[in-house]
């Protein structure tokens, strides 16, 4: 596995909130969240859509970015969502 293939993603949940996470394979991670095998939060509030915020990072950088995004306000996350790369299933 390439050390610089980690992505930071946002999931829009059915309650209109955003869930932030990292993965070396975001498409596979979305499938896990959708199947109820992801985070507890996405088991309760089902995913509606996912967007990639940033990619091509090593795991440490991705973790630091995730922490920073989780500290943002809902409005700031919404803006980040609007600027993020759409997943193929969303286009």
UniProtKB/Swiss-Prot annotation:
Domain GIY-YIG span(s) in chain numbering: 4-83
Domain of life of the native organism: Bacteria
Cleaved signal peptide residues: none
One Pfam family it belongs to: GIY-YIG
InterPro entries, sorted: GIY-YIG_endonuc, GIY-YIG_endonuc_sf, UPF0213_domain
Family: Belongs to the UPF0213 family.
Protein's name in the database: UPF0213 protein NMA2126
